[in-house]
């Protein structure tokens, strides 16, 4: 995993080598320019004095001027060769970097399948300028925190850490794989301990994001989706009991329509996401139900029958919470499974193109496949892909691009 250190050590001398070669190329360029200026002056003097001197002198001067021209041409060729050597040097280091990145990607994929695509997308999101944030979801941040994104919570207790490593590890955090067993166990525990205040205190004091954090080997995309949905349900659980049912549906609709940082689900993590989400939703709703029952018992501590009624209502709330979370998880599973083909299609990102490679054609893409050149010497684009200009084979005779053709027609109509 020391690819970065090895590569940095390899290119340590590259800046000095490039500086020396560019300096040498600049000196050769000045030498050629000075030689050309002197030759132009000699040619002018030669033609001025040609009629006054003998033919032998003219031939001698002509041969000397030609010799100096050939020498300047050789220096110019050497300068071009030096530029090609510099290009090959940089290109060789770029190819080496691509190879090292490919090896590092293979190691990451071996440990966590599909993690490289998530990290690449996250890196692109961090490099793109931040968009205006909705005030209903996230408080306004300072310019130093523009790159931090909080999914859908009104309250933020996470300190800003700019390192990508921390954010990547946060994406790797997932919930337990056996969520269905924990879902049932959570319901039973809530029913059996409805009269114990210590259990209520523990459940209500733990933050939602601390539930069921397990190993990094499971799907990171499923963990991110589960965390976002759980935070939405946590905000719902804090509302009044009369508004909780309708607001839970609204929270689910808002979660379903959210892009969730652009992370696409893989087929392997879809089923896992639904089960882990069921476990998290169960614990959240169970915690809210027990909190309501605790407040009810606290206000009626002197009435024994009222306390028993509160305990029974807590049990019924727990049962309804478990059934609601299971139904919501089942519905989410269907939504995720239906969205998998589209997300797989849209998530195909080509990472092989060099960002410094020239762009051509009206599509502003790199050179690939068969291309045709515009015969207009002043064409700003010059090269076009066959498919972009509606060609299936090489055109016969001269060919002009649509822009140049339209410009020529406009000039022709003006002359008429």
UniProtKB/Swiss-Prot annotation:
Listed InterPro entries: ING3_PHD, ING_fam, ING_N_histone-binding, Zinc_finger_PHD-type_CS, Znf_FYVE_PHD, Znf_PHD, Znf_PHD-finger, Znf_RING/FYVE/PHD
Composition bias type Basic residues, residue spans: 136-152
GO MF terms held by the record: zinc ion binding
PHD-type zinc finger span: 358-407
The protein, known as: Inhibitor of growth protein 3
Biased composition (Polar residues): 177-187
Biological source species: Xenopus laevis
Functional note: Component of the NuA4 histone acetyltransferase (HAT) complex which is involved in transcriptional activation of select genes principally by acetylation of nucleosomal histone H4 and H2A. This modification may both alter nucleosome - DNA interactions and promote interaction of the modified histones with other proteins which positively regulate transcription. NuA4 may also play a direct role in DNA repair when directly recruited to sites of DNA damage.
Keywords, comma-separated and alphabetical: Chromatin regulator, Growth regulation, Metal-binding, Nucleus, Transcription, Transcription regulation, Zinc, Zinc-finger
Residues annotated as site: Histone H3K4me3 binding: 360, 371, 375, 383
Assembly notes: Interacts with H3K4me3 and to a lesser extent with H3K4me2. Component of the NuA4 histone acetyltransferase complex.
Signal peptide span: none
A UniProt-annotated Pfam family: ING
Family to which this protein belongs: Belongs to the ING family.
Main location: nucleus
Highest taxon above the source species: Eukaryota
Comp. bias intervals (Low complexity): 189-198, 283-293, 302-319
GO biological process: chromatin remodeling
Region (Disordered): 126-165, 177-198, 283-319
Cross-referenced Gene3D superfamilies: 6.10.140.1740, Zinc/RING finger domain, C3HC4 (zinc finger)
Domain commentary: The PHD-type zinc finger mediates the binding to H3K4me3.
């Amino acid at each position: 995993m020391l690819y970065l250190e090895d590569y940095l050590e390899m290119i340590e001398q590259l800046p000095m080598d490039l500086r020396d070669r560019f300096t040498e190329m600049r000196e050769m360029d000045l030498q050629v320019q000075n030689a050309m200026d002197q030759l132009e002056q000699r040619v002018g003097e030669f033609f001025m004095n040609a009629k006054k001197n003998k033919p032998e002198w003219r031939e001698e001067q002509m041969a000397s001027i030609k010799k100096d021209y050939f020498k300047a041409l050789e220096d110019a060729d050497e300068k071009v060769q030096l530029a090609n050597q510099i290009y090959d040097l940089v290109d060789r280091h770029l190819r080496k970097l691509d190879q090292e990145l490919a090896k590092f990607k293979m190691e990451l994929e071996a440990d966590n399948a599909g993690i490289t695509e998530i990290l690449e997308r996250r890196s692109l999101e961090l490099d793109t300028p931040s968009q205006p944030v909705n005030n209903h979801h996230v408080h306004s941040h300072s310019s130093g925190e523009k790159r931090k994104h909080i999914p859908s919570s009104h309250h933020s207790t996470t300190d800003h850490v700019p390192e990508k490593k921390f954010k990547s590890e946060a994406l790797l955090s997932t919930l337990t794989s056996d969520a269905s067993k924990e879902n049932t166990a959570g319901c039973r525990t809530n029913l059996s301990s409805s009269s114990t205040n210590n259990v209520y205190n523990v459940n209500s004091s733990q933050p939602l994001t601390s539930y069921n954090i397990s190993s990094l080997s499971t799907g990171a995309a499923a963990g991110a989706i589960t965390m976002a949905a759980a935070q939405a349900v946590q905000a719902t659980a804090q509302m009044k009991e009369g508004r909780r049912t309708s607001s839970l549906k609204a929270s689910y609709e808002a979660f379903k329509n959210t892009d969730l940082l652009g992370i696409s689900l893989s087929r392997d993590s879809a089923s896992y996401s639904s089960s882990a989400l069921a476990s998290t939703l169960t614990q959240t709703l169970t915690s809210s139900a027990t909190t309501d029952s605790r407040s009810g018992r606290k206000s009626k501590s002197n009435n024994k029958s009222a306390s028993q009624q509160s305990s029974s209502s807590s049990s019924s709330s727990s049962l309804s919470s478990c059934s609601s979370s299971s139904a919501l998880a089942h519905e989410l599973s269907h939504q995720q499974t239906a969205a998998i083909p589209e997300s797989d299609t849209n998530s195909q990102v080509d990472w092989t193109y060099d960002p410094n490679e020239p762009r051509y054609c009206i599509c502003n893409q790199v050179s690939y496949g068969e291309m045709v050149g515009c015969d207009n010497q002043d064409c700003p684009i010059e090269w076009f892909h066959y498919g972009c200009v509606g060609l299936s084979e090489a055109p016969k005779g001269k060919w002009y691009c649509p822009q140049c053709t339209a410009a020529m027609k406009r000039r022709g109509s003006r002359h008429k």
